Amino acid sequence: MSHRRAVFAAVLQLIACSGGTLVAHHSFSMFEMDKNVTYEGVVVEYMWVNPHTHFTVDIKTGPDVDPATVGRWDVEGGSTNIMARQGWTRATLKPGERITLVGHPMKDGSKGISLFYMIRPDGKRLYHDIARPKDEASQ
């Protein structure tokens, strides 16, 4: 086998072996990204982990709450790196804190939300990512 073919075969093998990791990260296609909902709730758990931060919130009130939405919700944020650039830390949330969530609901209606931003009791907004309205860039 020529050197060129050996290199080509090695590259193909490397691509084939890493294929699982290339597609392992899910997209946000499970969320209704063109729809925002607002819920108020109490933090149950906050997980500062990669690939996405997660927290669990007991939802009881909010402008978009009906009896079907009351309950424990899983909230998905960005990676710890992305969240840190938005002002989040490992200590941002504590169980028992009351917060307001604005985000994108699951398409299948299950109790999950992709975070757009959170409003703390002091009124401060913390965003999931850098995408935010220009008039709120300094908040």
Report the location of each language-model feature:
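Bacterial N-terminal signal peptides that target proteins for export
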Residues: 1-11
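Short nucleic-acid-contacting surface segments enriched for D/E, G, S/T with interspersed K/R
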Residues: 85-100
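OB-fold/S1-family single-stranded nucleic acid-binding modules
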Residues: 106-130
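Bacterial N-terminal signal peptides
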Residues: 9-21
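Short aromatic-glycine-enriched beta-strand elements
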Residues: 49-62
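Short, structured beta-strand/loop micro-motifs enriched in basic residues and often containing a Trp
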Residues: 76-85
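Short boundary/loop segments of OB/S1/cold-shock single-stranded nucleic-acid-binding domains
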Residues: 23-37
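Conserved hydrophobic positions within beta-strands
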Residues: 41-43, 98
